[in-house]
């Protein structure tokens, strides 16, 4: 099983960051790669579309409001992986209430791709996503 993790310090309090990204259907609010998110199954599943119209279906598998993190599994996607589970987490930065550290991590099994290829793919997705979050917070 492969894994990757990317962290980024962003210029907003952990509470403000979580209020933006903590909703399972909130990806279009901060992630340009996902312009559409539709909640199904009572909000436990999100049906996403990317700019090319490809469908990604994800299931919420863990949510913790107090600790500011959630995990999800990909059920369907155009990515060469299976067994994908990812977590988005907002951390406090000691001694600072005006910034937060956001960590996006995942583990997955390559499917018709090498471990390095899928690790590079998701490292890039997470990095670009956290860059987009930073840009949203500074706009």
Residue ranges and their predicted role:
Residues 11-14, 62-66, 90-101:
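A short, structured loop/turn motif at beta-sheet edges
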Residues 3-7, 43-45, 55, 69, ...:
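Intrinsic-disorder/low-complexity, polar/charged segments enriched in Ser/Thr/Lys/Arg/Asp/Glu/Gln
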Residues 1-41:
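Hydrophobic ligand-binding cavity/cleft-lining segments
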Residues 10-12, 50, 110:
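Short beta-strand-to-loop capping motifs
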Residues 75-128, 133-135:
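Beta-strand/loop substructures that line and gate deep hydrophobic ligand-binding cavities in soluble
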């Amino acid at each position: 099983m492969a894994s990757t993790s990317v962290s980024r310090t962003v210029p907003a309090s952990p509470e403000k960051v979580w209020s933006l990204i903590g909703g399972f259907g909130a990806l279009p609010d901060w992630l340009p790669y996902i312009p559409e998110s539709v909640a199904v199954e009572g909000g436990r599943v999100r049906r996403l579309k990317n700019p090319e119209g490809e469908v990604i279906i994800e299931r919420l598998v863990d949510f913790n409001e107090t600790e500011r993190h959630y995990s999800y599994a990909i059920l369907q996607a155009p990515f060469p992986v299976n067994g994908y589970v990812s977590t988005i987490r907002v951390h406090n930065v000691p001694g600072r209430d005006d910034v937060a550290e956001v960590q996006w991590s995942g583990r997955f099994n390559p499917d018709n791709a090498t471990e390095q290829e899928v690790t590079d793919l998701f490292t890039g997705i997470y990095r670009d996503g956290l860059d987009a979050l930073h840009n949203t917070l500074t706009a």
